[in-house]
Curated annotation (Swiss-Prot):
Domain Pyruvate carboxyltransferase: 5-267
Protein name stated in the entry: 2-isopropylmalate synthase
Gene that this polypeptide is encoded by: leuA
Lineage, top ranks: Bacteria, Pseudomonadati, Pseudomonadota, Gammaproteobacteria, Alteromonadales
Cited PANTHER family: 2-ISOPROPYLMALATE SYNTHASE 1, CHLOROPLASTIC-RELATED, HOMOCITRATE SYNTHASE-RELATED
Keywords, sorted A to Z: Amino-acid biosynthesis, Branched-chain amino acid biosynthesis, Cytoplasm, Leucine biosynthesis, Manganese, Metal-binding, Transferase
Amino acid sequence: MSNRVIIFDTTLRDGEQALAASLSVKEKLQIAMALERLGVDVMEVGFPVSSPGDFESVQTIARTIKNSRVCALSRALEKDIDAAAQALSVADQFRIHTFISTSTIHVESKLKRSFDQVLEMAVGAVKYARRFTDDVEFSCEDAGRTPIDNLCRMVEAAILAGARTINIPDTVGYTVPSEFGNIIQTLFNRVPNIDQAVISVHCHDDLGLSVANSITAVQHGARQIECTINGIGERAGNCSLEEIAMILATRKGMLGLETGINAKEIHRTSNLVSQLCNMPVQANKAIVGANAFTHSSGIHQDGMLKAQNTYEIMTPESIGLNRNNLNMTSRSGRHVIKHRMEEMGYSEHDYNMDTLYEEFLKLADKKGQVFDYDLEALAFMEAQAEEDNHYQLQQLVVQSDSTEGVATATVRIEVGGEIKTEAATGNGPVDAAYNAIARATDRRIDIISYKLGAKGVGQNALGQVDITAVYHEQNFHGVGLATDVVEASARALVHVMNLTCRADKVADYKQSMQKNRELGGV
């Protein structure tokens, strides 16, 4: 048996079913091209019979993608198969994926037929699909709850009819790994023509076991895993592609299996899908979460500085990230602070480590995470260790035109002790407020991230806005709290403005320090 596991991505079909709004054809094509770069073997990109829009997107992707096999879904109905075949006909290579329910509850309650009738429909659908392509996949929907005798009969009949891939879905995420592995093993033991098809699995995450079930399945002989980027999909989602790829890569010595995935594209693809689907990735998500390669414990950070594999079983570079993160918090030791200062180009002779660490702990206790620009200010600006409020927002007034979408904001802001008042328009109240603040401060920054949340519960909750902005190629993080979201946004921007002002002062100090070094060396 081959040790190569086929990766079948269904982000654009099953994954899209989780979205509040459908993706456009252009957005689907962007994701499809990213999946091709990622190296998926098969991409299921839609259900052509469901709508003209789905038909168009499947056809557009089929015409464009060259290095992955494009697949479309169809029920075990001729009209569905016709639509799939027509949409896919422009592709160099394609697969038709047809399915029917096989569990007792589905057969009796949903289809209202006998199992023998359903088996006959399945065989007919596979034979009909084979008129258009040799690459036909058949799925036994809700296989995880199908009586094993019926499942064996269905699989044998579908293979005999011409299916070259047989998919065993745990449609409702019901099984546990030992149970699901036993289903796959039983099929291999009891279906006489099983060697004529690739056994695939499609596991849902209702009990959080989709990845575990999929890995167990390939240990028992399955050689295709159906999955999605970031695990998005119906209800609790699908098996996560990035987790499967990195499990098989990281534990290759134990599992003896491999994929064709270009892991260095994982992070980029995950970000693209998250942005286009408007589905943020949870911070603690395996492989692609913001905290996946972040270390805050002082003990862990110490180990990481001595040897990276003490607390990392894979490198961030392996999925396309530049490096891991050692978050500077009150749990960070002196060695981490020294390491960060060295990375920023400072020798231990440039600052007093005892004083710096003492001030660092005070600031970390107050604000949680300390950033590089905070550390520099603590090291070289003693009196400015607290945030330098060069800018202070005194008043914000916003007027919006609900019909035109244009807003006007007027700000009164203190700039180095001088009161300035400016007004500006914008595409909405937040944009107008930002434009007015930029005029008043004459300081331009680029906002690359804006997150809106709440602090507190119920009527007493405050709006919290977190922004990340770029200034002189460095990222700065600002937070604003207020009962009004627009005011919270303005306060977050002013917070960033003050951080950049302080960074300018640190830069001036560094420049003078460098000049003194040069003069001392003459």
